[in-house]
């Protein structure tokens, strides 16, 4: 999980979602997981 000021999709399978008011990227590749913080 990477915490970044701006989250971007890295590959085609990355999805941007909102969880508890936080913007997150979920993906099949665990290295692509990000959240905004």
Swiss-Prot record:
The keyword Transcription does not apply. Keywords: Ribonucleoprotein, Ribosomal protein. One of its GO terms (molecular function) is structural constituent of ribosome. InterPro entries: Ribosomal_bL36, Ribosomal_bL36_sp. It comes from the Bacteria. GO terms for biological process: translation. PROSITE patterns: RIBOSOMAL_L36. The keyword Ribosomal protein applies. One of its GO terms (cellular component) is cytoplasm. Belongs to the bacterial ribosomal protein bL36 family. This is Large ribosomal subunit protein bL36. The gene is rpmJ.
